[in-house]
Curated annotation (Swiss-Prot):
GO molecular function: ATP binding; nicotinate-nucleotide adenylyltransferase activity
InterPro entries for the chain: Cyt_trans-like, NadD/NMNAT, Rossmann-like_a/b/a_fold
SUPFAM superfamilies, sorted: Nucleotidylyl transferase
Name of the protein described by the UniProt record: Probable nicotinate-nucleotide adenylyltransferase
Pathways involved: Cofactor biosynthesis; NAD(+) biosynthesis; deamido-NAD(+) from nicotinate D-ribonucleotide: step 1/1
PANTHER family in UniProt: NICOTINATE-NUCLEOTIDE ADENYLYLTRANSFERASE-RELATED, PHOSPHOPANTETHEINE ADENYLYLTRANSFERASE
Tree of life domain: Bacteria
Iron-sulfur found in the keyword field: no
Single biological process term from Gene Ontology: NAD biosynthetic process
Signal peptide extent: none
Catalytic activity line of the entry: nicotinate beta-D-ribonucleotide + ATP + H(+) = deamido-NAD(+) + diphosphate
Species whose genome carries this gene: Dehalococcoides mccartyi (strain ATCC BAA-2266 / KCTC 15142 / 195)
The keyword ATP-binding is annotated on this UniProt entry: yes
Family: Belongs to the NadD family.
Amino acid sequence: MVSLKTGILGGTFDPIHTGHLILAEEVKKRLGLDEIIFIPTGQPYYKADKTISPAADRLNMVKLAISGKPYFRVMDIEIKRSGPTYTADTLNDLKLILPEKTELYFILGWDNLEALPRWHKASEIIRLCQLVAVPRIGQAKPDVDELDDKLPGLQQSLIMLSKPEVDVSSSLVRERLENGQGVEHLVPEAVAAYIKEHGLYHRQ
């Protein structure tokens, strides 16, 4: 059986934006991945004190954003799970759901790579997948040797990419919408229409 190379891109996607899509396209191309699965978070443990948009809206926006791209798909496994969202649990679930020979490539920003040694079951994460670390605007490149000291084995599981650097964030999109500004080119057209139709991110 031929191995399937599957990228995993998790996030709150509140909302999904063009930066997420550019990133996914670039990683797929650079690493020769067969597909990328977008996984909207339930209630991330690191955002437990923050209000995020309803899971159904975030899931629907991802579906709209990736429509027409057969190598992109979305799974709601974290949304369906009760309690906090942990990456190690998601990767274990994917190992059970996906075909046996699937190789997982977990995509994360340099900022999250820096924090990885403090993540729940971090050593299990690096055992279950290849990490694909991508730059974040304004984020210095992490010291991988130092991180490997904190989390032995990390370097063997790590692919560091120097691009794409995408200057778009969900918080920027939300801020512009709250201020009544346009978000053309920041989110796909279908997502912008959904946001408008459902009155998301507008000041009450």
